[in-house]
Amino acid sequence: MIQEASFIMLMGGDPFKQKEMCEKLGIIEDLKSFDGIMMGFSAGAMLMSKYIIITPCSLEYPEFRIENGLDFDNLSIYPHNNTSNIEYPDVLSVGEETYKKQDLIKVANQYGKFYLLQDNLREDGLTDVSIIKSINGVIEYYYEFDGKIWVVNHDIELLDKKINKVVI
């Protein structure tokens, strides 16, 4: 059934439950070999990643949890890192979740670089959007309004929108 589709959208929720459900349905290999367009939002983007990454950030996730994802194009996504700052703060609180810069860097040192994406709902009702498009290893970055993408490696650096594609 999956191979007959031309488009698959993986939605949000708990990325580990989403992966478990796909395993129980026996569709992991079908998703990995899918030849159409696949889009992931939130947990869906995390499932498409090389690694599903959660740092200790809340009562729901008090410890590091990192599992293999579908590994499309060897990149990993960690969504919902919403801040208006240009410099990534040492501690970022988003709702009931708290992200520590040192925890994010620790993961990158062990598992390789990954991307933090912003999808901030603004006071004016608009949403700051950031998107990564990857086709066969060719990566493009898209932003709307004040969307941001950070690269986590040995530090956390904001991608320079001047040298990356900026459209939506």
Describe each model-derived feature in a short phrase:
Residues P15-K24, Y88-P89:
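Glycine/threonine-rich flexible loop motifs
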Residues F7, I54-I168:
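C-terminal and late-domain segments of enzyme folds
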Residues M1, K24-G36:
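Catalytic-core regions built around general acid/base machinery
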Residues M11, F34-Y51:
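Catalytic nucleophile loop
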Residues E20-K24, F41, L70, E97:
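Short capping loops/turns at secondary-structure boundaries
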Residues P15-K17, A45-L47, S84, I132:
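Glycine-rich nucleotide phosphate-binding loop and flanking beta-alpha elements
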Residues M21, D30, K106-Q110:
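Residues that form generic nucleotide/phosphate-binding pockets
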Residues M1-K17:
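Portal/gating segments that form or line small-molecule/metal binding sites
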